[in-house]
């Protein structure tokens, strides 16, 4: 299989097991400490400039950081997080007082609800077919984000203990990268740090949701108890719950300790069948405590 090409949904559907165990692995914020630089220097900066929100940049950035980094929404696809970043400040007094008009994002809501894979190819097709100016502006933002990431995010090696963990996984399981990052960026980053050969497929946002990745590649091919997802966001947990598999959390802010625990303890438990139950529940409970659902400027 050509290691530098981008994969398709057919690759996931036709994925053939070589082991009786499957591991899905997220990338940004999980394998690589890239979320902060991507979000703060690329995503959020370009939200402000694309929709001329300079007057309220402080609040836009605060909201975008909450939505993308410091909440239970962390790790979701860029388009729902763009919508959420704006929706969370629509009624914020400081924003209302500024007089700045926020984008309505009516067409974005329809795109998100359409059921198509939420990536640039589907967005570009829809924007071209409809001539919708809002969709065109979102597509420009998304392409500009990709270009900024390609230019900015370099020489960011994986967290400590990742490589040792991937060595263990490759020897005893079939592994794929399961992400909502564009595939092009994933392939580039995994290749840059010589990690590409540890996974059989790199699945990004163009191939569907994380749960769809797992459904296509793992569900029905492996016993549910032999499916594991490693991730740093609640979306990773819900994705693997959708196929009744297990979850190992990479705790935000404690990533290296999480990977060390995986490498020295958790993966062995998963392989010998003692991972599920009290051990997994304790890890998930610890993980869930780290990420709030409501931003501090919204009263519960």
Model features per residue range: what roles?
Residues 26, 68-80, 277-287:
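A short, hydrophobic secondary-structure junction motif
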Residues 10-11, 18-20, 30-184:
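Alpha-helical substrate-recognition element adjacent to the catalytic core
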Residues 21-23, 227:
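The start of beta-strands in P-loop NTPase/AAA+ ATPase cores
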Residues 16-18, 222:
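Residue-level detector of transmembrane insertion/anchoring sites
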Residues 25, 141, 251-252:
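Short loop/turn segments at strand-loop or loop-helix junctions that form parts
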Residues 4, 25-26, 30:
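Non-catalytic protein-protein interaction scaffold segments in large eukaryotic complex-forming proteins
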Residues 2-3, 154-174, 181-300:
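C-terminal cap/substrate-recognition subdomain and adjoining C-terminal extension
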Residues 4-14:
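A short, compositionally biased domain-edge/stem linker segment
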